[in-house]
Amino acid sequence: MFQDVLVITVAAGRGGDGAVSFRREKFVPKGGPDGGDGGRGGSVYLRARGSVDSLSRLSKRTYKAEDGEHGRGSQQHGRGGEDLVIEVPRGTRVFDADTGELLADLTEEGQTVLVARGGAGGRGNMHFVTPTRQAPRFAEAGEEGEKRRLRLELMLIADVGLVGYPNAGKSSLLAAMTRAHPKIAPYPFTTLSPNLGVVEVSEEERFTLADIPGIIEGASEGKGLGLEFLRHIARTRVLLYVLDAADEPLKTLETLRKEVGAYDPALLRRPSLVALNKVDLLEEEAVKALADALAREGLAVLPVSALTGVGLPALKEALHALVRSTPPPEMPKPVPRKEVQAGVEVVPVAEGVYEVRAPEVERYLARIKGDLMEAAGYLQEVFRRQGVEAALRAKGVRAGDLVRIGGLEFEYIPEV
C-alpha cells in the first residue's frame, strides 16, 4: 500500500548514569573514588534510500534508540547506546509535527539527518575530586534523550509529471514510454497511487515520468484523488497534460490548469506540453482541428496514441529537450536554528524569597545523583560559572534570604 504522509514519534536514548564507587582492594592504600562514566544514549537519524518507495514500510509509530549503559566501579565506563537509522524514500520532507518547521528535505541517495540527539552520559564520582573534596559521594545522572513528533511528507523526484483526467490514458502512456507496469483498466480511478517510470532516450540519456491519480473538476476543493497527490509534481521540471482526444479536450485542459493553479499558481509557469492521446479513435482531419485549437491556448500539442505508438517518438524528443533545458524547481529549504543561550533571571516571589530561573543551571541540578549536601561545593562552582551568584548580587539578595532554583531551596550565603 502506497503511503506518502506519516506522523511518527522518535525518541533518542537516555544517557547512562555515572557511578559512585570507591576502590576497595586489599593492600591498596588510598584507593579513592573510581566511579566510571555512563555511556551516551543512542541518537535517531533518517536516511534517504532509493530502494524505499513508500512510507508504508514504517510500520511502527514510535521509534526509540538504545539507552546508554551506566558506569561502574574500577573506572569502567558504560557502553554508548546504539544509534537508530530509519530509512525513508528519496524525496521525503521532514517537519516538526508540533511547530510545522521544515527540518530536512532528503533528496540525495544516502542523505542523512539527525532528528533526535541522544542524552549525554553522566560523569562518575572520580571527576569531582578536588583538594578539599577527596571522597565525593555524588555523580551525574545521564541526560534524557530528545523526543519529538515528526511529520514525513513524500514528494516524488521526477523530471516530468503527467496530469490528466481519470481514464485519459496516463498509465497507458507511462507503460508505452517506459518499462513501468502500472495498473491499467477501462474505468476511472484505476490509478490510486503515483507511479514512476524511466524513459530511455539513448544509452546515456534518460529522464523520469511521474503518473499521479487523475484530477477531476473540484479537486482543489477536495473532490477526487488527484489533489491529494499533486505534491508529487511539485519537484518536476516539466508538466505533461494528457488529454483524451475523444472527450472534450479543450474543456478538459481548461479545467486541469484551473485546478493545478488553485493548488499552486507557480505550477502554471512550469514548462508544459499537451499530449492529445487516443487519436487512433478519430479521423486525421478531426485530430488536426483539435490540435490547432489546443495550440491556441499557448502550449505545444503532440497528437499521440499510447495504444498504437503513434507520435510517441516525437513526444519523447520534445519532453527530453524541455527537461534538458529546464533546471529543477527551487524548493523551500530548511532554515538552520540558532541556539539561544538561556540567561539567568532572579524573580522576587515574597519578602526575602527569590526564585532563580536558569535552564542551564537547572539541568545541572537535575543530574546530581547521590549526596546533595556533599555536592554543595560543586553546585556553588556551577552557580558562579553560570552567573547565578552575580545575578543574585545584582538583584540585591541579602545573606539569609531564601533562594529557590530547580526544586531546591537554600539560604543565601554570599561568597566572600
From Swiss-Prot:
Sites where the protein binds Mg(2+): S171, T191
Compartment(s) where it occurs, according to its Swiss-Prot or TrEMBL record: Cytoplasm
Domain called Obg: residue spans: 1-157
Listed Basic and acidic residues bias regions: 63-72
Record domain OBG-type G: where: 158-324
Residues the record lists as binding GTP: 164-171, 189-193, 211-214, 277-280, 305-307
Top enzyme class: hydrolase
Pfam families hit by this protein: DUF1967, GTP1_OBG, MMR_HSR1
Biased composition, class Gly residues, residue ranges: 32-42
Cofactor section: Mg(2+)
Gene3D superfamilies: GTP-binding protein OBG, C-terminal domain (3.30.300.350), GTP1/OBG domain (2.70.210.12), P-loop containing nucleotide triphosphate hydrolases (3.40.50.300)
Keywords: Cytoplasm, GTP-binding, Hydrolase, Magnesium, Metal-binding, Nucleotide-binding
Protein EC: 3.6.5.-
GO cellular component, one term: cytoplasm
MF-aspect GO terms: GTP binding; GTPase activity; magnesium ion binding
Residue intervals of the OCT domain: 336-414
Region described as Disordered: 25-44, 62-82
Family: Belongs to the TRAFAC class OBG-HflX-like GTPase superfamily. OBG GTPase family.
Quaternary structure and partners: Monomer.
Protein function: An essential GTPase which binds GTP, GDP and possibly (p)ppGpp with moderate affinity, with high nucleotide exchange rates and a fairly low GTP hydrolysis rate. Plays a role in control of the cell cycle, stress response, ribosome biogenesis and in those bacteria that undergo differentiation, in morphogenesis control.
Name under which the protein is recorded: GTPase Obg
Phylogenetic classification of the source organism: Bacteria, Thermotogati, Deinococcota, Deinococci, Thermales
Primary gene name: obg
